């Protein structure tokens, strides 16, 4: 569906969000969005509205209910206000390519913010399911990419029920009313907005499902007072930030995994599966990451920082771990108790993999041991993993 198929929800008011072309233009090797008319309508789950601090995933609408018929206008200047309401919009998303495979120099957009604004925005997004798994670097990039959108007047429609969505919004100032029409789309006339179901105030957010795919909005959100302020993030920027950081991290993990003796013969595909399953954990200085005597359950890659291994009865550390080192790999083979403790010397970030996750992805470890002939290695095991008893 072309961008011209969407009518601005702002009507006679000036549109502070820019033209569709401006909003959708992103540098980099981004493929066009392909949308199709579908034989069956796309439904959406019921939405629970709360006030104040209301958040709702405005990403889907009830396409089974047909809106008023649409037709092309007689004049060539634009489409009628109801043109898009009768159309069923498929769920789609842009095809993006990592920078390592495309020779562009894309960098995340950055819009300066005060310390107070950053704190409010961070609190607004940290409880949202789309942002809960982000690491510090990704969160900083997301916060930097949010762009300010002043809403100067009352009754300006920010999103319109039934329209395709591509922006997520955080409210910094003002109030916004939420309306839902039972037909699934906003209708013409004074009653076309539907029922008022909630109010979004400062610190609230809406439209998060637009960051995942291009689906019809499930509600209309409009300013309830003048001089409101929103911060907006578009889907392409969000997905690009996540894709680039995830791609870089996976490549780093795969390089680390190549250095692990019992995993050295994994294929590239197997390493990529393991890399995707690694879970990032952070520990402040002085934290016991692994305790001597505990059963060996997890294998760790050290992303950054330093950690030390200690054994009971020995005052000095038996080993120092730095970025790129690994420990606890024999936990993938058995559940024997740890023979040493690992304590973070500085703040550390590790990537952890449990034995159960490893077996779920690649099956039993024994075939891999046969591949590497790890059973035959009897000497030097303590040097490779001082956490495992001899």
From Swiss-Prot:
<feature type="region of interest" description="Disordered">
    <location>
        <begin position="1"/>
        <end position="81"/>
    </location>
</feature>
<dbReference type="GO" id="GO:0030552">
    <property type="term" value="F:cAMP binding"/>
</dbReference>
<protein>
    <recommendedName>
        <fullName>cAMP-dependent protein kinase regulatory subunit</fullName>
    </recommendedName>
</protein>
<dbReference type="InterPro" id="IPR014710">
    <property type="entry name" value="RmlC-like_jellyroll"/>
</dbReference>
<dbReference type="GO" id="GO:0005829">
    <property type="term" value="C:cytosol"/>
</dbReference>
<feature type="modified residue" description="Phosphoserine">
    <location>
        <position position="90"/>
    </location>
</feature>
<comment type="similarity">
    <text>Belongs to the cAMP-dependent kinase regulatory chain family.</text>
</comment>
<feature type="region of interest" description="Dimerization and phosphorylation">
    <location>
        <begin position="1"/>
        <end position="129"/>
    </location>
</feature>
<dbReference type="InterPro" id="IPR050503">
    <property type="entry name" value="cAMP-dep_PK_reg_su-like"/>
</dbReference>
<dbReference type="GO" id="GO:0005952">
    <property type="term" value="C:cAMP-dependent protein kinase complex"/>
</dbReference>
<keyword id="KW-0547">Nucleotide-binding</keyword>
<feature type="compositionally biased region" description="Polar residues">
    <location>
        <begin position="1"/>
        <end position="17"/>
    </location>
</feature>
<dbReference type="GO" id="GO:0005634">
    <property type="term" value="C:nucleus"/>
</dbReference>
<feature type="binding site">
    <location>
        <position position="329"/>
    </location>
    <ligand>
        <name>3',5'-cyclic AMP 2</name>
    </ligand>
</feature>
<feature type="binding site">
    <location>
        <position position="338"/>
    </location>
    <ligand>
        <name>3',5'-cyclic AMP 2</name>
    </ligand>
</feature>
<dbReference type="InterPro" id="IPR000595">
    <property type="entry name" value="cNMP-bd_dom"/>
</dbReference>
<keyword id="KW-0677">Repeat</keyword>
<dbReference type="InterPro" id="IPR018490">
    <property type="entry name" value="cNMP-bd_dom_sf"/>
</dbReference>
<feature type="binding site">
    <location>
        <position position="217"/>
    </location>
    <ligand>
        <name>3',5'-cyclic AMP 1</name>
    </ligand>
</feature>
<feature type="binding site">
    <location>
        <begin position="130"/>
        <end position="261"/>
    </location>
    <ligand>
        <name>3',5'-cyclic AMP 1</name>
    </ligand>
</feature>
<dbReference type="GO" id="GO:0004862">
    <property type="term" value="F:cAMP-dependent protein kinase inhibitor activity"/>
</dbReference>
<dbReference type="InterPro" id="IPR012198">
    <property type="entry name" value="cAMP_dep_PK_reg_su"/>
</dbReference>
<dbReference type="GO" id="GO:0034236">
    <property type="term" value="F:protein kinase A catalytic subunit binding"/>
</dbReference>
<feature type="binding site">
    <location>
        <position position="208"/>
    </location>
    <ligand>
        <name>3',5'-cyclic AMP 1</name>
    </ligand>
</feature>
<keyword id="KW-0597">Phosphoprotein</keyword>
<keyword id="KW-0116">cAMP-binding</keyword>
<dbReference type="Pfam" id="PF00027">
    <property type="entry name" value="cNMP_binding"/>
</dbReference>
<keyword id="KW-0114">cAMP</keyword>
<comment type="subunit">
    <text>Tetramer, composed of 2 regulatory (R) and 2 catalytic (C) subunits. In the presence of cAMP it dissociates into 2 active monomeric C subunits and an R dimer.</text>
</comment>
<feature type="binding site">
    <location>
        <begin position="262"/>
        <end position="383"/>
    </location>
    <ligand>
        <name>3',5'-cyclic AMP 2</name>
    </ligand>
</feature>
<dbReference type="InterPro" id="IPR018488">
    <property type="entry name" value="cNMP-bd_CS"/>
</dbReference>
């Amino acid at each position: 569906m072309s961008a011209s198929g969407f009518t601005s929800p702002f009507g006679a008011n000036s549109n502070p969000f820019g033209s569709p072309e401006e909003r959708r233009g992103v540098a980099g090797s981004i493929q066009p969005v392909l949308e199709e008319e579908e034989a069956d309508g796309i439904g959406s789950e019921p939405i629970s509205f709360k006030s104040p601090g209301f958040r709702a995933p405005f990403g889907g609408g009830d396409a089974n209910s047909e809106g008023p018929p649409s037709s092309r206008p007689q004049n060539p200047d634009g489409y009628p206000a109801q043109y898009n309401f009768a159309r069923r919009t498929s769920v789609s998303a842009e095809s993006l390519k990592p920078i390592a495979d495309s020779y562009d120099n894309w960098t995340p957009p950055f819009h300066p913010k005060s310390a107070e604004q950053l704190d409010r925005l961070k609190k607004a997004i940290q409880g949202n399911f789309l942002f809960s798994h982000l690491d510090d670097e990704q969160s900083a990039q997301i916060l930097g990419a949010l762009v300010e959108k002043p809403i100067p007047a009352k009754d300006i429609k920010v999103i319109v029920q039934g329209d395709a969505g591509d922006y997520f919004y955080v409210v910094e100032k003002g109030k916004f009313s939420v309306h839902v029409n039972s037909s699934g789309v906003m209708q013409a006339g004074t009653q076309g907005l539907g029922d008022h179901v909630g109010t979004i105030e400062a610190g609230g957010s809406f439209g998060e499902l637009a960051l995942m795919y291009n689906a019809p909005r499930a509600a209309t959100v409009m300013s309830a007072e003048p001089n409101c302020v929103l911060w907006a993030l578009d889907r392409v920027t969000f997905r690009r930030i996540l894709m680039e950081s995830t791609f870089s991290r996976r490549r780093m993990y795969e390089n680390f995994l190549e250095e692990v003796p019992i995993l050295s013969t994994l294929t590239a595909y197997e390493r990529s599966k393991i890399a995707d399953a690694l879970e990032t954990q952070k520990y402040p200085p002085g934290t016991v990451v692994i305790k001597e005597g505990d059963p060996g359950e997890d294998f760790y890659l050290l992303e950054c920082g330093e950690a030390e291994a200690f054994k009971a009865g020995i005052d000095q550390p038996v080993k120092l771990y730095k970025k790129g080192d690994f420990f606890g790999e024999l936990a993938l083979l058995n559940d024997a108790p740890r023979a040493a403790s690992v304590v973070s010397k500085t703040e550390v970030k590790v990537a952890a993999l449990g034995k159960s996750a490893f077996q779920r992805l690649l099956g039993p470890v024994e075939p891999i041991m046969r591949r590497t002939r790890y059973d035959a290695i009897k000497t030097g095991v303590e040097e490779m993993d001082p956490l495992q008893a001899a």
